[in-house]
């Protein structure tokens, strides 16, 4: 893994920082990347590009909270792609969770979502955001019921799920051409730290093997099909495409 510093800016977080550094098997060495425990949350910083700002997970406020309240509910393309309809709340495995935005949208609409995240730094950010959201007075109740996280390689996690989800959702990292300033910032930090999803093509057959009803792959509108496998249908949005592979066994 790329070297990363773990820093406790808040003295009360010193023990948590030490535990995280041990878990990540990181010494307190110099690195352009730092996981920083502040008073409010855990955040990732690229120290040699401070203008990029910090990256952290926040399910309670900001863009994801706005989308939960005003994003179109079950009429959203992602909801249609996973098969959300009246009386049907699919169980979903998000095998490429990242910062958990899509998983959160699906959970807020009623899905039971298990997030898988391969990179330990991203998983640490996600775990912190999840814990804070579960303690929130407004959304904590259903967050505890509907969202969970497993860290580790996606392929291994898929093969060792122990249950059959209705849907496996894939959104492998892809070089984005046009994105909002926020995502551009995050992509620059992420791609230099995390790297590309080199096993992305292999994820599709693995997902098809474990999903009960469908596999959904989110792609930029200009990207080819994952693993060059043509889906049964596609749902197009302004800048993305949801390729849907329906399971027939």
Swiss-Prot record:
GO terms for molecular function: rRNA (guanine-N2-)-methyltransferase activity. Signal peptide: none annotated. It catalyses: guanosine(1516) in 16S rRNA + S-adenosyl-L-methionine = N(2)-methylguanosine(1516) in 16S rRNA + S-adenosyl-L-homocysteine + H(+). The keyword Methyltransferase applies. It is an enzyme of class 2 (transferase). CDD domains: AdoMet_MTases. It is found in: Cytoplasm. Its EC number is 2.1.1.242. Keywords: Cytoplasm, Methyltransferase, rRNA processing, S-adenosyl-L-methionine, Transferase. The keyword Nucleus does not apply. One of its GO terms (cellular component) is cytoplasm. S-adenosyl-L-methionine binds at residues 101-102, 117-118, 171. InterPro entries: 16SrRNA_methylTrfase_J, SAM-dependent_MTases_sf. HAMAP family: 16SrRNA_methyltr_J. Specifically methylates the guanosine in position 1516 of 16S rRNA. Belongs to the methyltransferase superfamily. RsmJ family. This is Ribosomal RNA small subunit methyltransferase J. It comes from Tolumonas auensis (strain DSM 9187 / NBRC 110442 / TA 4).
